[in-house]
């Protein structure tokens, strides 16, 4: 397997990043982990982000989970997406942590969600549970930016969810809110609380929340680009 020296320097442009991602297509996670000298976990229960970290290593990402994009110098976010044998997404896609305080004056145009989704390198990975992690293959990459219709759907959901947060209704929001974007708790344990605004404007402690893309958004997007 000849990929390149590891870990590579951050990519200098979109074309170089896409070429690197294309070079990984068809390899199993076991092959990539072995080449990188990484231990492969038995499953992803305790280390959900492992696949993304492995691919970031190969692609030369720098941001980790900081607010900027994974490839901040060229303005691109990496999103791995587990897919079924039919090419359909198997789970929702984490976008970023939701701000629960200090939101006066925030707009869709200046939001982290819009920033993170402005330009995305999607890398599908086999995700069906009966396939052992080491045997799951990496799929063909896709460079994507939301079209007008997609951006409008995202903006509408984001504004509705942020209105509820600002009005002190964060604890009334369920995963069913939003057509394509949902807000739900993001915490490894229920003791990791963060400050938010309550219904009467008072500070409250609640679970951190994250924005996630629903499968009803990523499914049609993948189908359109890969002609499924």
Swiss-Prot record:
What GO molecular function terms would the record report? DNA binding; endonuclease activity
Identify the SUPFAM superfamilies for this entry: Restriction endonuclease-like (SSF52980)
What is any one of the record's Gene Ontology cellular component terms?
Answer: cytoplasm
Biological process, per Gene Ontology: DNA modification; mismatch repair
Tell me where it resides.
Cytoplasm
Against Pfam families, the record matches this protein to: MutH
Keywords attached to this entry: Cytoplasm, DNA damage, DNA repair, Endonuclease, Hydrolase, Nuclease
* Function text: Sequence-specific endonuclease that cleaves unmethylated GATC sequences. It is involved in DNA mismatch repair.
Q: Which family does it belong to?
A: Belongs to the MutH family.
Protein name as catalogued: DNA mismatch repair protein MutH
Give the organism the record lists: Yersinia enterocolitica serotype O:8 / biotype 1B (strain NCTC 13174 / 8081)
- Give the classification, highest ranks: Bacteria, Pseudomonadati, Pseudomonadota, Gammaproteobacteria, Enterobacterales
């Amino acid at each position: 397997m000849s990929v390149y020296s590891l870990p590579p320097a951050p990519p200098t442009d979109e074309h170089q990043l896409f070429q690197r991602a294309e070079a990984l297509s068809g390899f199993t996670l076991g092959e990539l982990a072995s080449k990188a000298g990484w231990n492969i976990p038995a499953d992803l229960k305790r280390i959900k982000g492992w696949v993304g970290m492995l691919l970031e290593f190969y692609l030369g990402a720098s941001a980790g989970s900081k607010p900027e994009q994974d490839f901040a110098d060229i303005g691109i976010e990496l999103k791995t997406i587990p897919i079924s044998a039919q090419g359909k997404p198997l789970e929702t896609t984490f976008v970023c942590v939701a701000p629960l305080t200090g939101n006066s004056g925030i707009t869709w145009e200046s939001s982290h969600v819009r920033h993170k989704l402005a330009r995305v390198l999607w890398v599908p990975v086999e995700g069906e549970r009966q396939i052992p992690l080491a045997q799951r293959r990496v799929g063909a990459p896709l460079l994507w930016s939301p079209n007008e219709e997609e951006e409008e759907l995202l903006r509408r959901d984001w504004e509705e969810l942020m209105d509820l947060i600002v009005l002190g209704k964060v604890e009334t929001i369920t995963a069913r809110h939003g057509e394509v974007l949902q807000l739900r708790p993001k915490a490894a344990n229920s003791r990791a609380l963060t400050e938010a605004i309550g219904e009467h404007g008072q500070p409250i402690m609640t679970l951190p929340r994250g924005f996630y893309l629903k499968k009803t958004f990523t499914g049609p997007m993948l189908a359109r680009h890969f002609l499924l």
